[in-house]
Amino acid sequence: MLKILNMNEYISLNHYLILSSLVFTIGMFGLFMHRKNIINILMSIELMLLAVNINFVAFSVYMQELSGQIFSIIILTVAAAETAIGLAILLIYFRNKGSIKITDINKMRG
């Protein structure tokens, strides 16, 4: 008979938390390093949201509850909608102004 491997035997909660903190740090680093380009900022924010989702799923598996996994799916859905709306706004702004630099967008203030 085939034995189904339980991944919790090999990968502990600490591994998931380390992975999550690394992904969050990469997203934070990208957020601070690429302040001029809005698309890079959106990608960095998505990385940070992914790190939060890894935490939710890891704790959900560790505590043997489904609520964290369900909440993670809801967060991913909302984040996808947020990104789609943000990119649509950026596309319209680029068609009108010809640039998507942060400095040009900050000039829109009244």
Swiss-Prot record:
Organism: Rickettsia typhi (strain ATCC VR-144 / Wilmington)
InterPro entries: NADH_UbQ_OxRdtase_chain4L/K, NUOK/Mnh_C1-like
Subcellular location: Cell inner membrane
Alphabetical keyword list: Cell inner membrane, Cell membrane, Membrane, NAD, Quinone, Translocase, Transmembrane, Transmembrane helix, Transport
Keyword Transmembrane helix attached: yes
Gene Ontology, cellular component aspect: NADH dehydrogenase complex; plasma membrane
Catalysed conversion reaction: a quinone + NADH + 5 H(+)(in) = a quinol + NAD(+) + 4 H(+)(out)
Membrane topology type: Multi-pass membrane protein
Name used for this protein in its record: NADH-quinone oxidoreductase subunit K
Enzyme class: translocase
Family, per entry: Belongs to the complex I subunit 4L family.
Domain of life: Bacteria
Documented EC number(s): 7.1.1.-
Entry's transmembrane regions: 13-33, 41-61, 73-93
Gene3D superfamilies xrefs: 1.10.287.3510
Role of this protein: NDH-1 shuttles electrons from NADH, via FMN and iron-sulfur (Fe-S) centers, to quinones in the respiratory chain. The immediate electron acceptor for the enzyme in this species is believed to be ubiquinone. Couples the redox reaction to proton translocation (for every two electrons transferred, four hydrogen ions are translocated across the cytoplasmic membrane), and thus conserves the redox energy in a proton gradient.
Gene Ontology MF term list: NADH:ubiquinone reductase (non-electrogenic) activity; quinone binding
Stored Pfam families: Oxidored_q2 (PF00420)
Subunit record text: NDH-1 is composed of 14 different subunits. Subunits NuoA, H, J, K, L, M, N constitute the membrane sector of the complex.
Gene Ontology BP annotations: ATP synthesis coupled electron transport
